[in-house]
Amino acid sequence: MEKQLCDYLLVALQVDPTIDRPGIKNKPIQSVYERYVQLQACKYVDEILVYETEYDLLQLIKTQTLHIRFLSEEYMNRDFTGKQYCIDNGIELHYHKRQHNYSSSELRSRTAKLENMKNQEFTSTLPQHSSELAYKMSEK
């Protein structure tokens, strides 16, 4: 959808949002390289710029020739890095709807649940020793 609104799609990829927003954002599960490769595989992405901090992102916004900035609709009524700069400099803000229910928080929750189930299954398959055997083992 975004590519229909622009000629050149530049994607900014943050290394780790917890660097300057700990406790607010989640640490990425995948490495920056893995995420970069996934973006690179998308036929609509023309260029990927990697940045570390929100300050770095603002510098990218200020130094690139941008006409439109795409954000998730969850940012519509929030303040965010570069919002005022975009408004002041005629960079259109386009808020897109999330067409899916995937999120890193939900993925973490599912992964933790499955890992917990796996650990419980493993523990339940361990042989249970009698208290007499446990006592004998402790005497050695």
Predicted regions and their residues:
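Nucleotidyltransferase catalytic core that binds NTPs
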Residues: 1-140
